[in-house]
């Protein structure tokens, strides 16, 4: 575990209700910031430099893009060392593939997320590089 001021930041964008991974994020060694919309997450990225970004992918119907995550993933270009994990409903796998073709992410996990898989990934990403 990192000392309190030395722990890396994890920004979680939780638009799908029904789960709380904050305790798991903290156990993996992160300071945690949670936003409930991409718009608020984009505002938060003006003052926060996260090591990990965890975002929900939910299929929304936009006329010009697959998801509002496109804006978030584009903003992540300012943080080249940040790791991006997308949590998704398996029913939207083809829509997620479209998004990832435009804006790559480091990993995806289907909902409901298996805590052990998430924890292993986060512990690996929490280690200093």
Language-model features: where?
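Non-catalytic signal-transmission and effector/linker regions of two-component phosphorelay proteins
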Residues: 1-24, 73-81, 114-129
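Acidic, metal-coordinating helix/loop segments flanking the phosphotransfer/catalytic sites
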Residues: 36-52, 62
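Conserved phosphotransfer microenvironments
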Residues: 52-79, 88-95
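Short, aromatic/basic amphipathic alpha-helical patches
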Residues: 21-27, 71-72, 95-103
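A generic structural motif
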Residues: 28-32
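Structural motif
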Residues: 11-17, 56-59, 87-90, 111
